[in-house]
């Protein structure tokens, strides 16, 4: 990884690799701030982006374990506004070109991104992309309750359960947590996950007194060529003051900041053991591919991702590709748009966390190489 820092492909990276529950390697290389020559330390704070999703997934599964919601409950049981959905017809040219949904959205479908919701990010030029952006669904000034109202006025991309599309589903689940628990999302996460696991630096913004520990964010030289050297500072992504001050919208899909030790604490809590956050059956279910046989996840800008299904809150590898470690069948993993990544592979008895701040993406050649080497090092 030092080579990639020297080549200006990544500014810096922190990682921890586990064999079973034991940390066998933990290091930081490179910079937290290249311009200031600030060397990266374990206590530096990263923008988690979509690493946030696993926290909200765990919150939902805690409520499921307590019997307060069910995985196959219709969403209107918690959020009546999202009942009686409309779906865009095949080949629709306007938001009015819709038909009734064949079935309601379920909690399970929200966890697996099979609900029919979209993101309004990855599919520019489409009818739904335009609709999401005109409604400003992702506006950080919009509280979760108001975001649900905006989504209620928009059609689904496909019938619930009939496809896979990365989406605002986890933000919707954040609102479900609030409605079911009676607490704000940040309060629930703090009480049930952050405090329970001793996570002292994870939250929806970095307090002013700690902002000197926030890692600088950089753009790569070319979004389409992640191996092209060159980094440009981009601290105002995805919007000015993001992660530096509180915003009304507590984004369950991408709003948290965290550190390597905090992320490591969560990953360890998702491994079998007496101090696991969730029950063994719950963890097994989360790490089980929920998609139909042969179906893979896909992104509008990338196409299908070979060998990858989806569990409850993360991708599941059912057929490793040449980019993957050969013994990664059953690996449960996800990451964030600014270069954070976590994985758990029960079969290979390994898990890990990788933290960088290079926008955009976590499925890049340098991370693939790191993970292959990590698996080799632990015998996986």
What is each model feature region?
Residues 1, 21, 47-78, 84-85, ...:
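Active-site SXXK
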Residues 77, 85-326:
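Short, surface-exposed loop or secondary-structure junction motifs
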């Amino acid at each position: 990884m030092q080579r990639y820092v020297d080549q200006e492909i990544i500014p810096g990276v922190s990682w921890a690799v586990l064999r079973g529950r034991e940390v066998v390697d933990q290091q930081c290389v490179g910079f937290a701030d290249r311009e200031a020559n600030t060397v990266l330390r374990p206590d530096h704070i990263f923008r988690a982006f979509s690493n946030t999703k696993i926290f909200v997934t765990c919150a939902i599964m805690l409520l499921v374990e307590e019997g307060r919601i069910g995985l196959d409950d219709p969403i209107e049981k918690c959020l009546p506004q999202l009942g009686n959905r409309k779906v865009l017809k095949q080949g629709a040219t306007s938001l009015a070109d819709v038909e009734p949904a064949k079935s309601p959205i379920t909690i399970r479908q929200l966890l697996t991104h099979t609900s029919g919701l979209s993101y309004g990010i990855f599919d520019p030029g489409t009818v739904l992309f335009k609709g999401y952006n005109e409604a400003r669904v992702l506006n950080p000034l919009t509280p979760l309750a108001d975001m649900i109202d905006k989504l209620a006025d928009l059609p689904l991309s496909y019938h619930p359960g009939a496809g896979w599309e990365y989406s605002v589903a986890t933000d919707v689940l954040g609102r479900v947590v609030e409605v079911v628990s009676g607490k704000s999302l940040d309060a629930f996460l703090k009480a049930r996950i952050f405090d329970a696991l001793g996570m002292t630096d994870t939250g929806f913004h970095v307090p002013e007194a700690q902002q000197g520990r926030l890692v600088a964010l950089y753009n790569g030289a070319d979004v389409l060529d992640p191996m092209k050297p060159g980094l440009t500072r981009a601290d105002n992504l995805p919007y000015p003051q993001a992660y530096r001050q509180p915003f009304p919208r507590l984004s369950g899909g991408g709003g948290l900041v965290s550190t390597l030790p905090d992320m490591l604490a969560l990953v360890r809590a998702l491994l079998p053991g007496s101090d696991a956050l969730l029950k063994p059956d719950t963890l097994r279910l989360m790490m089980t591919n929920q998609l139909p046989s042969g179906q893979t996840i896909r992104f509008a800008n990338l196409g299908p991702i070979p060998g990858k299904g989806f569990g409850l809150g993360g991708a599941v590898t059912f057929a490793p590709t040449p980019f993957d470690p050969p013994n990664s069948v059953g690996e449960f993993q996800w990451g964030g748009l600014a270069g954070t990544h976590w994985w758990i592979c029960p079969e290979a008895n390994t898990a890990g966390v990788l933290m960088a701040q290079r926008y955009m993406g976590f499925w890049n050649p340098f991370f693939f190489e790191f993970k292959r080497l990590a698996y080799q090092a632990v015998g996986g």
